[in-house]
Amino acid sequence: MATTKISSTKSTSRAINYAEKRAEEKSALNCDIDYAKSSFKATREMYGKTDGNEGHVVIQSFKPNEVTPEQCNQLGLELAEKIAPNHQVAVYTHNDTDHVHNHIVINSIDLETGKKFNNNKKALHDIRQANDEICVSHNLSIPEEKAKLRYTQAEYSVLNKGKTSWKDEIRHAIDQSQAASYEELGNDLQQNGIKIERITDKTITYRHLEEDKKVRGKKLGEDYDKGGLEIGFNRQNEQREEQARQRELEQARREKIKRDKEREKEWARFNRSTQAIRQNRERSEREERERERKARELEEQNRRAREERARQERENKHTHEKTRGFDLEL
């Protein structure tokens, strides 16, 4: 029986240090196991992806006495090849607890695309499915109570041949859908040649149109029955509500920016208007002062002219009187 879980890590170096310290077996994919830390770092730097999560750690555990450490490590490497074929992966096997288990450290960068490994619900689903397929191919048990997928022996036979069953096509179509209701799910499935045949209070039945075969959701696994679907619908609705809220916040932010810019423009227009008024007033005051100065100068000139005329008149009068007195003496 093999179980898996996945977590993200901010430091692959710390994850490797911890895993390597107690490793009984170790192996690697797309890198040298003895230089895994430096290889991981060099790849992230080459693609400029040095922020955020540096990698992910998958814990693959087996029940006691089911596999040897050597077998466990080989199964871990096989899982790595299935779930992260284009990533650098280091596999470390521990045997210091009651069950042997692997620490599978995955570098975040895809060597071909440069994109990061997407650790989400689908990734966990794919890891568990791949792990189940590996266990079946090696005649190992699967924890039925924890299995998200339910395969028949016929499906396992198809999987072992490297083919995809019609039931897996239904699972894949449901996994790809982002529906938030049965109506939306039905529309998505219809585009993939699958029909929701029947929905009751407790069950849902699908039909694969090309194969003309039906199957109940619970036969596919708990994620595909009504309970699992409705959990997914609720999660999708919550995501949509959150996205709508974020859009509203973004719209409000943009409107505020727009209002602030308009306010800045209004203040700029007001400042320009105020400046123009001040400049006009100052110009008027200068012109008024200039007129007053010229008026004073003109008044001063007139005063001096009057004084000059008065002086001339006095001199003329004095001269006339002197001339008259001289004439009388003669």
Swiss-Prot record:
Region (Disordered), start-end ranges: 220-330
Regions crossing the membrane: none
Biased composition (Basic and acidic residues): 237-269, 279-330
Keyword Hydrolase appears in the UniProt entry: no
Pfam families found in the cross-reference section: Relaxase
Keywords, comma-separated and alphabetical: Plasmid
Keyword field contains Transcription regulation: no
Role of this protein: This protein is probably required for relaxation complex formation and plasmid mobilization by conjugative plasmids.
Protein name: Protein rlx
Organism annotation: Staphylococcus aureus
Gene (UniProt): rlx
